[in-house]
Structures are given as C-alpha cells and as structure tokens.
Amino acid sequence: MANTHVHHEYYAHVLSSMEERITTSILGRPDAPIEFPDIRARFEPYLGWLEQDFVMPVCFEDLIHNRQRTLERMLDHLEAGGYRLPTSRERALETFERAIDPTRSPTFREGKTGAWREHFTAEHRALFAQVSGDLLQRLGYE
C-alpha cells in the first residue's frame, strides 16, 4: 500500500501482521475516522452495474494474463455501443495501458493472480464467506 493511501498509517503502524491486515480488509473499520466499510459494503454500490447491458465486466486476472486481448475487447465494446474513438485504435490501446499502470495505484502490491491463497488462513476464508455473502458469485468467481 502506497504511503499516500488514506489508510496507510493504520495498516503500516497499527496493524502488525499480514493476518491482521487481511482481517481488517474483510471486516472494515466501523470506528475509523475515515470511512472503511466491510468488503461486501465496499462492493455493494457497484454490483448493480453488472445488470446493465452497456457494462462490460473485466476481471483483474484477464488484465494480467490476457492484457492485450482484454484491452481490445474493451475498445470493441465501446465502439459497439456507438462510441467513436477520437484517435487511432493503437493510440487508444496505449492510453488504456498507461491508465492501468500498477505503479500509479495506491493499493498495488504485487500484480499477480491467486496470491490470496498464500496469505488467507482457513479463518480468513470462513470470515470472508460470512461477510461477503454471494459477492464472489456475483462477480463471477464462483
């Protein structure tokens, strides 16, 4: 987590282990001076988008393992919806690449898929299932 992230101080100086950080990320911080809800509540405002015809869901794994094809599909989706690119397709793809540069993200850690398996304990898995409900299903992961 970048030191400019709003919750950096808490994660870096109050929480002392990866286990505590994962638990806090799942449960949120109801007492925090800066809003930080549980994992389900953080996703809830966006779940309705999945029901919209004009929305193209994109998962992190596709951006990592099939980046070029995924970015091309995103452009195809925009154009199919009537959007006219103001530049060449190649330039638009370059713009997309810059926009998803992980080094510019305050929450970027490693940029690899499946790493959660290395850190989630059985307790984390159970807690995540309890708090998130059907979130993984709605996002297409189960």
Model-flagged regions — what are they?
Residues 66, 115, 123:
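Amphipathic alpha-helical recognition patches that constitute DNA-binding helices
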